[in-house]
Amino acid sequence: HLLADAGVDVLIFDTTNRATYKDVYMKLCEVFTEVRASGGHTPQITFMTNTEAGATADELYKDLYEPGLYRDLWFQWEGKPLLIVDPAAASETVKNFFTLRKAHWPFEMVNTERAWHWEATFPQPYGFTDDPAKPEQVNVSVAQNLRASDGKVTDMSRGDARGRTFHDGAIDRSPGAILHGYNFAEQWKRAWELDPPIVMVTGWNEWIAGRFEREGLPVAFVDQFDAVNSRDIEMMKGGHGDNYYYQLVDGIRRYKGAPTLPEASAPITIAINEDFAQWNAVAPTFADAPDDTIARDHAGVNKLHYANTTGRNELLNFKVARDAENVYFYAATGKDLSPTE
């Protein structure tokens, strides 16, 4: 619901380290299908590959595409399902079935032909199809594991990366800078300027905070280290909360546009104890996504366990009416309201 409400059109699964997480994406496809069946909206899906790209692409094709599973969720580009894989590594079957784009990593900040950028320094280069002057794709990232000084690749844990507070060529270390999304905002400016058909945002969440060893460093975290040096948009408890989610919403709306706000209907007096039909003339209707009261119960890191059973009532549609003396509220539920005690 969060992604669809934000205006996200396609969810790109990161399978760049060879693992495809089949159980995970299949479950998401199942849930997306259920959401659509109940009247909701979801993004389309595709995958990005890198390590052993050819084998990864073949596995994805065999498990999902060849049997035709969840066909209505496949993201289409140039008349075929899109897959981000190096054409030089792809099998003939994959080449024939998909529209291919190569993943471009931030080792070189150049515009790229038929290659989509995973991450880049501001002002970001872009990917193009045939005409180098016509952008096809640009990346917008919350933060980058790229050095503040020269844009070269670094680890998020080294202290020199372009974290969430980087902007105007420097790391902003002022109190509360993390709350403002300066880096993310700067990247969005470039996307609005280029206005390509594809803006790829990195990223919704990081699957794991990988700990590595480096020469001279006993501990190194490449992609995710702390609140500043990470690039999750997904909300957190405490800290920056849902700031980056709403910044994503703002960025997408400025890029794609948004519908005009509906006008309110004329004043009307509602007789509380009479038929609900009197609400038919009241506009606008505010709709909530269905199926969002499901209890959450899942293991976290180490011994942590996350549980939330507070969702009770499925509230679907809302209206507000007014006259000279009163304001009236209407709420339609999916099922009978649960008791207050």
Language-model regions, residue ranges each:
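Glycan-processing catalytic domains of CAZymes
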Residues: 1-271, 275-276, 283
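Surface-exposed, glycine/proline- and aromatic-rich loop segments on solvent-exposed faces
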Residues: 270-341
